[in-house]
C-alpha cells in the first residue's frame, strides 16, 4: 500500500481516569509502532483541557484499511473496551490529506 494518511485523534478523558487513560494508550502505542505500515505518532496533552490527550498519526495505508484492519487488532481490544469508561465523550478522529512536509535542514 503506497497511500499515506495522517489524522488527529482527540481523547477527552474523565479527570478521575487521567492516568489510566494515558497508561492504557501508551501500551497500545508501543504495540502499534511495530505495525509494518506505521510511520509515526506524536502524543500530546491539551493545554486547555489537561484531561484530553491528542494524537497525530501517520500511516502508509488508506483510511478504510486503517479503520477495518488496525482498529480491530488484538492488542487494542482491552483499550477499546475501556474507552467508554475512561472518556467523558466519544473520541474524534479527523483524517487529513498530507500536502507537504517541512523539516529543519541538517546542520
Cite the ranges covered by each PLM segment.
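Glycine-rich beta-strand-turn "strand-cap" elements at beta-sheet edges
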Residues: 1-5, 42-51, 80-107
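Short, flexible segments with low predicted structural confidence
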Residues: 3-5, 20, 37-38
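Short, well-ordered beta-strand segments in beta-rich or mixed alpha/beta enzyme
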Residues: 5-12, 40-70
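Short, surface-exposed ligand-recognition loops at beta-strand->loop->(often short) alpha-helix junctions
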Residues: 12-21
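An amphipathic, aromatic/His-enriched active-site/gating alpha helix that lines ligand/cofactor pockets
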Residues: 27, 33-39, 58-94
